[in-house]
């Protein structure tokens, strides 16, 4: 992310939020409002940050093959995902410690998702809790993501509460058996509020297995998402175990160092899924062209984390709505310049 941070630091005029026209303006506002600890938490990654850089490199090294002289007057950037018609195939990815970026914490992205027309996946280590976030946008569908920090009763309690509060899917993060060293944070002895509140006893996550997933599937009627899939082999296992959504993710480069970039993994996972499970992808997705590349390679939706955090830090839910509007403009333009009017083409 170092290259991106340097590119964000350009001279920009001071304008009102509703007049923002570029991602750089959100970055400038966010960096002004966040302290250095929170900025580094948002844009930092594990150890050498190689996986994080590879996320961006995978996107940047994938080039388009545009077609011309086609009627692209009516471009449709919407999509269906988890039974929902979305204005963009975007899931605001789970971020712990959103309360470090904005006073509304997890409620802000949910409100923005409801106003814009996409989905928010709430992290279990994000205030103010799943009930309060559900109440912030009671008529809009949302997803809950869990870090397994307790036994079967702990898991069941969260699934039941999610169901009782109208969440339409339940995600398990499966790439956090061990907590990585995020050296930007460690060097400053910085601990996020989410980590302080939740505690990080990893024993239960280390033992969490396919048997535990099956137990939840057998007991509850809710679509299951596994977040943190990075190989065809695990994607095959997802299909064999009836997983509804395979979430290709390397935790934004914040867990295993020297992993592959997300987009580099996508094609093999889509092939392994073989249409029997939906596939979503996160990892470095910041621009409309990034989203279009993921959809062209078979994703059903993308997760956006740092994009979301940066916009929220810049100005709360209204800023995130504006950022999503600009993203939609970029997606529509990219599709049109490619000579297509939908992702299916």
What is the predicted function of each stretch?
Residues 1-39, 179-186, 253-278, 285-345:
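Conserved active-site-proximal phosphate/metal-binding subdomains
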Residues 2-86, 182, 191-208, 345:
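An N-cap/entry alpha-helix motif that binds or orients negatively charged groups
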Residues 21, 46, 50-54, 108, ...:
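Conserved active-site and cofactor/substrate-binding residues in soluble primary-metabolism enzymes
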Residues 47, 57-64, 138, 164-168, ...:
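Generic secondary-structure signature for well-ordered alpha-helical cores
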Residues 63, 78-80, 89-93, 119-123, ...:
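Short, conserved beta-strand segments within well-ordered enzyme catalytic domains
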Residues 86-130:
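Glycine-rich active-site/cofactor-binding loop and its immediate structural neighborhood
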Residues 97, 110-111, 135-139, 150-281, ...:
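Alpha/beta enzyme core
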Residues 114-136, 140-155:
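A gly/proline- and charged-residue-enriched helix-loop-helix capping module
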């Amino acid at each position: 992310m170092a290259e991106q941070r340097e590119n964000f630091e350009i001279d920009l005029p001071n304008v009102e939020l509703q007049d923002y026209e570029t991602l750089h303006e959100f970055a400038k506002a966010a960096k002004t409002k966040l302290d250095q600890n929170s900025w580094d938490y948002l844009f930092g990654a594990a150890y050498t940050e190689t996986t994080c850089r590879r996320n961006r490199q995978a996107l940047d090294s994938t080039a388009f093959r545009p077609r011309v002289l086609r009627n692209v007057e009516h471009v449709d950037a919407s999509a269906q995902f988890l039974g929902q018609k979305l204005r963009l195939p975007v899931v605001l990815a789970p971020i712990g410690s959103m309360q470090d970026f904005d006073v509304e914490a997890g409620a802000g992205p949910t409100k923005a998702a409801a106003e814009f027309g996409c989905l928010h996946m709430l992290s279990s280590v994000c205030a103010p809790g799943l009930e309060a976030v559900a109440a912030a946008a009671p008529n809009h569908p949302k997803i809950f993501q869990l870090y397994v920090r307790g036994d079967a009763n702990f898991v069941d309690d969260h699934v039941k509460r999610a169901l009782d509060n109208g969440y339409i899917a339940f995600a398990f993060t499966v790439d956090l058996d061990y907590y990585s060293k995020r050296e930007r944070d460690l060097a400053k002895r910085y601990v996020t509020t989410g980590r302080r509140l939740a505690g990080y006893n990893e024993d239960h996550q280390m033992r969490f297995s396919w048997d535990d997933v099956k137990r939840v599937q057998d007991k509850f009627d809710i679509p299951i998402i596994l977040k943190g899939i990075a190989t065809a082999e695990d994607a095959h296992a997802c299909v064999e175990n009836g997983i509804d959504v395979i979430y290709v993710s390397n935790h934004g480069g914040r867990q295993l160092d020297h992993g592959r970039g997300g987009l580099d993994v996508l094609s093999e996972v889509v092939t392994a899924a073989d249409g029997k499970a939906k596939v979503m992808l996160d990892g470095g997705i910041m621009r409309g062209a990034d989203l279009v590349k993921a959809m062209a390679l078979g994703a059903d939706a993308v997760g956006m984390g740092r994009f979301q955090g940066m916009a929220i830090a810049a100005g709360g839910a209204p800023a995130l709505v504006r950022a999503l509007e600009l993203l939609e403009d970029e997606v529509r333009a990219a599709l049109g310049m490619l000579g297509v009017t939908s992702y299916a083409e």
